Amino acid sequence: MKDFIKNVGATIVGIFLFGIIIGIFGVMSLVGMVASGQATKNVKENSVLVLKLQGDLQEQAQDDVLGQLTGNTFNSLGMDAISSAIKKAKANKDIKGIYLETGILGADVAQLQELRDQLVDFKKSGKWIVAYSDMYTQGCYYLATAADKVYINPEGSINWHGIGSQPMFVKDLLAKFGVKMQVIKVGKYKSATEMFTEEKMSDANREQTQRYIQSLWDNMCKDVSKSRNISTAKLNDLADNGIFVANGKMLLAEKMVDGVKYADEMKAEVKKLLKLDADEKISQLSIADMATVKEEDTDGDDEIAVYYAYGDIVDSPAAGSLFSNSHAIVGNDVCKDLEELANDDDVKAVVIRINSGGGSAYASEQMWHQIDLLKKKKPVVISMGGMAASGGYYMSCNANYIFAEPTTLTGSIGIFGVIPNFSDLATNKLGLKFDEVKTNRNALFGLQARMMNEEEVTFLQGAITRGYHLFRQRVADGRKMTVDQVEQIAQGHVFTGEDALKIKLVDELGGLDKAVAKAAALAKTKSYYTQGYPAPLDFFDQLLQESTDNGSYLDGKLKTSLGTLYEPMKMVNNITTMDRIQARMPWWLIINN
């Protein structure tokens, strides 16, 4: 029996030690894989950059090393990585052109507009771009029209149908569960709360939504018209008369594409452009490959920091939720990062790239203050992405200079408060009973199993009004306007970048490149390089984060599966924990572009 126990014990110890050894070798292999990915890539002569655009487009690239190893990944692309790849390809003499292949790309119109402008700029080098897809979404077709030639599969389609917004209202749904939202707001156009209190859009919200989606569509049509030599009237006619169900041959007849080909035939087309024989291989470079290609002429003396801030503005990250890993602007984290940049003597100016519809009014004010401190030490320039509205505009308004794309959604200067009331759910649906013991009249303020009384509503209305007045004053000070001037364009009113320029909410139209150039000019430096912040998480940081956050894989899958319903569902999930006072655009802004 002793020998048996000894043998079992020895076997267990042996298995344990073997597991440790395998684990060590596994980690060493992973480190080697990560390190090898950073090696400089040599570009072969006569190469082509392949831009495969499919998935969710984020502002900043983040390699999901663990997801790649486990197979639990969902497609996510970084605007910064794509832009860098295009610039490097333009400058590299061995790269002859770009092959653009699109699928389903989750991107806002401003992001597409910025990428399109970069493709147009790429062609100034004399190099070619060809685009191909089995099925173009409307946004991807808009992007593809920057190419010299646009091709489609014979049975492919282009979803060219115009832009629509479909608000979602959850008042009746919540009522079925015994939940009622108590809402207080300031601003005629502050429509974010309508989803809780109304069954349809208010007249003011319908008017402003119609105005800005029309502006987005007009911008898209104008650019496509110029590239394809099709009048905007004709483009609207095609959208109204079902071109989105046409096949390749019909699209060719309408001059929306230059050719109809299968995927294998496109290889022959690219070989022809590269002047290769039929049996020669195409030297291809991906976006990931370009990250390791040395950029030409980047040995500047001074650093211009580009700080990426995108997602909901929150006081602290939401953990332990299916939605916990959605990217967010965490107020405290941003303040710490900006303080470090302020104290870094190597950094001569800071560009803050913002893509946010807002969120916590408290966090927005803290970031406004930190930008104010940063501005006293070095120039601060804002580059707006698809949205820099409400809280996103709050943190923007104090910069030295503000850039927006024509199709950026901005403004929305207003504040509201939402407190859910679960008393009907608890008492009538679940049979729960509550009693009260308190030291003071308002000791139960904020508890969600009761309605606020009139006095509490008055208190909260006062706090929200003060917050609105502070927001309005911040804009007036930052934009050198009077409070009355700000009030005329506030009240929660949403504007496109094009309109925002006319009313002085922004200084100039343009993308991130223009913002960087302006920051360098304000810092009085001609020899500079850019550095992105916050630094992407390395392998070990991702490993630690994965052990504490449970939602990354499921959140990615939810985002892919829910599509346009993802943001409203995330809001319902987070409503009980978010800050009571919010400066944000509507959660339900579903734009079919």
Which residues are covered by each model-predicted region?
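Hydrophobic alpha-helical transmembrane signal-anchor segments
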Residues: 3-38, 46
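Cleft-lining beta-strand/loop regions that shape enzyme active-site pockets
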Residues: 40, 49-167, 297-425
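Charged, glycine-interspersed solvent-exposed loop segments at helix/strand-loop junctions
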Residues: 167, 171-271, 423-503, 507-509, ...
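Surface-exposed, non-catalytic interaction/assembly patches
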Residues: 170-186, 275-298, 416, 420, ...
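Extracytoplasmic and endomembrane cell-envelope/extracellular-matrix remodeling and assembly machinery
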Residues: 266-309, 315-320, 367, 526, ...
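Intrinsic disorder and flexible/low-complexity segments
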Residues: 299-304, 308-344, 463, 534-593
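Short glycine/threonine-rich loop-to-helix capping motif typified by GTGT followed
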Residues: 361-366, 499-502, 542-547
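C-terminal recognition in membrane/secretory proteostasis and scaffolding
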Residues: 521-524, 529-534, 591
